[in-house]
């Protein structure tokens, strides 16, 4: 980084720091850094950028879409980059969900990390003939479908014993969850269970005791015990007040791997599954996405790379981004500065 002395001078010298000569006055510099200002977010240049999981699903949260809530069914566009836009807590409506008993709030962000996401065309399990049945598939007036009839989530079947003969207590039952996605895709299987007060538990299932549930897939095993009663009536989106609650969870199955669910009464059996593939970079941001940008930065929003480095807030960024540095960098493009009087004396 040696800088030589020139024979001409400048009235406005600049100071650069060098590794071998320390601070040096020079006749000219090129700034290498910029300090961004906060902006809106944008689509990332050269890639598809996804905001909401289902842009055409109006009045739906991303968790609604991930669970297949009626009226929230639609195509999830492919994307190499995804915006994590929802303010916590992430919730879904329809039937009252005990969101904090499981990791279900993480499901939308798990899906965002995939480039391609599709819902299976058929159910992974025949719920009506599953162990412990025969069952009827329950629906709720709190979960209206597209014709405003009673409905439920597309990813789960509410397995209610069909007749009095099997509305009885049962020992734990096990059902295998096959892998039905195609090679190269993962399978994200949603399941859960319903519980209510003692009176409703006896009416629906013939057993008022807490029920046990276990899921196992990809080396991960999770255990739950249902809570009986103690729930205040809760209505979702203008639906009927519900004395019961559902607990919803998900498991990730890798290609060709079978999962298992062990359950008692009140099971919400898996139905449609998500089949995601590829990878999408995820960054926290906000809507709307306006125009295009070289880089998306969690603190500054959309950035266009005018300089190779930037100063200011250091945060996650994706795309063709400048590199963060603590202090401004300059490139000397002139000679070492000497005052005019000293130059004349040396001559």
From Swiss-Prot:
The remark listed among the other comments is: Major glycoprotein, comprises over 80% of the envelope proteins present in virus particle.
Q: Does the keyword Glycoprotein apply?
A: yes
Q: What is its main location?
A: virion
- Stretches assigned to coiled coil: none
Q: Where in the cell is it found?
A: Virion membrane; Host apical cell membrane
What is the recorded name of this protein?
Hemagglutinin
Q: Return the InterPro entries for the record.
A: Capsid_hemagglutn, Hemagglutn_HA1_a/b_dom_sf, Hemagglutn_influenz_A/B
Annotated source species: Influenza B virus (strain B/Ibaraki/2/1985)
User: Keywords of this protein's UniProt record, alphabetized?
Assistant: Disulfide bond, Fusion of virus membrane with host endosomal membrane, Fusion of virus membrane with host membrane, Glycoprotein, Hemagglutinin, Host cell membrane, Host membrane, Host-virus interaction, Lipoprotein, Membrane, Palmitate, Transmembrane, Viral attachment to host cell, Viral envelope protein, Viral penetration into host cytoplasm, Virion, Virus entry into host cell
Top-rank lineage group of the source organism = Viruses
Gene3D superfamilies in the cross-refs: 3.90.209.20, Hemagglutinin Chain A, Domain 2 (2.10.77.10)
Subunit info here reads:
Homotrimer of disulfide-linked HA1-HA2.
According to its UniProt entry, the protein's GO biological process terms are: fusion of virus membrane with host endosome membrane; fusion of virus membrane with host plasma membrane; symbiont entry into host cell; virion attachment to host cell
Is-annotated flag, keyword Lipoprotein?
Answer: yes
Q: What does this protein do?
A: Binds to sialic acid-containing receptors on the cell surface, bringing about the attachment of the virus particle to the cell. Plays a major role in the determination of host range restriction and virulence. Class I viral fusion protein. Responsible for penetration of the virus into the cell cytoplasm by mediating the fusion of the membrane of the endocytosed virus particle with the endosomal membrane. Low pH in endosomes induce an irreversible conformational change in HA2, releasing the fusion hydrophobic peptide. Several trimers are required to form a competent fusion pore.
């Amino acid at each position: 980084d040696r800088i030589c002395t020139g024979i001409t001078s400048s009235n406005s010298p600049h100071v650069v720091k060098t590794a071998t000569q320390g601070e040096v006055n020079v006749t000219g510099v090129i700034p290498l850094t910029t300090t961004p200002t906060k902006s809106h977010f944008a689509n990332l240049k050269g890639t598809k950028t996804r905001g909401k999981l289902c842009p055409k699903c109006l009045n739906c949260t991303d968790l609604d879409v991930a669970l297949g809530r009626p009226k929230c069914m639609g195509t999830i566009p492919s994307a190499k980059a995804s915006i994590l836009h929802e303010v916590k807590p992430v919730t879904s409506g329809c039937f009252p969900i005990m969101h904090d008993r499981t990791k279900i709030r993480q499901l939308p962000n798990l899906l965002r990390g995939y480039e391609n996401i599709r819902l299976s065309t058929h159910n992974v399990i025949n719920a009506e003939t599953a162990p412990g049945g025969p069952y009827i598939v329950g629906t709720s007036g709190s979960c209206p479908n597209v014709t405003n009839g009673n409905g439920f989530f597309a990813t789960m079947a509410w397995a209610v014993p069909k007749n009095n003969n099997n509305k009885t207590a049962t020992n734990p039952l096990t059902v295998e969850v096959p892998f039905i996605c195609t090679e190269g895709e993962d399978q994200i299987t949603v399941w859960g269970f319903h519980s209510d007060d003692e009176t409703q538990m006896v009416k629906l299932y013939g057993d008022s005791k807490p029920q046990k549930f276990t899921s196992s897939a990809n080396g991960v095993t999770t255990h739950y015990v249902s809570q009986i009663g103690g729930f205040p009536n809760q209505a979702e989106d203008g639906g009927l007040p519900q004395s019961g609650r559902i607990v919803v969870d998900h498991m990730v199955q890798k290609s060709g791997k079978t999962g298992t669910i062990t359950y008692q009464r009140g099971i919400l059996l898996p139905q449609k599954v998500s089949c995601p593939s590829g990878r999408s970079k995820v960054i926290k941001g906000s809507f709307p996405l306006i125009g295009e940008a070289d880089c998306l930065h969690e603190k500054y929003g959309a950035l266009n790379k005018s300089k190779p480095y930037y100063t200011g807030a250091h945060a996650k960024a994706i795309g063709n981004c400048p590199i963060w540095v603590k202090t401004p960098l300059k490139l000397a493009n002139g000679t070492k500065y000497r005052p005019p009087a000293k130059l004349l004396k040396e001559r």
